[in-house]
Amino acid sequence: ILQHHKFENEISQSLKKYNKKGLKIGIAGEHLMPFYLRDILTSSMPDVEFPIVTDILDDMRKIKSSKEIELMEKAAEINDSVLTELKKIIKVGMTEQQVVAHADFLGRQLGADLGSATVVMSGKNTKFPAWRASEKKLKKGELLMVDFNPTIGHYCNDGGLTFLLPGASKYKTNALINSHKILKETISSIKSQ
């Protein structure tokens, strides 16, 4: 039998030393914080104020230094390089897992860490909003979606590409071409505020 350790008491005891009048501890991402954790904080430190600072932090994150911009650009370059190289490597008969392995290896060769798991979906699996790559083999004429997220210096780029494997029908080919046109038109219409 596994015993699950209840850490609430230990956390509560550790937090009590911070219970001081006038102390403020900002909470960011309050919509993600479990209620039980909020309850531990407020009951352990009843004299502390817990202002919501999500908007303040979001505004601060909008301002980037030249170094941060450089890291973001580097992550984007790595993403582009990996997806470009994948186009040359991917073959009918490979598994989704093999595509993931190639993407992750290429990204790491270029010095990136992974911001999140690489998503590879092919054929019938492309109908899911997110997918854990499987041993499903890539088939002739299928769509293949790759979502790769390289991270450099804690800055992550999230980019994806939809491939059309050789042997696709005219319908799929036209659908992909038209989707790409719409995407380009949409991007060019976006204006900074």
Regions of interest found by a model, annotated:
Residues 1-193:
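Active-site neighborhoods and metal-handling regions in enzymes and metal-associated proteins
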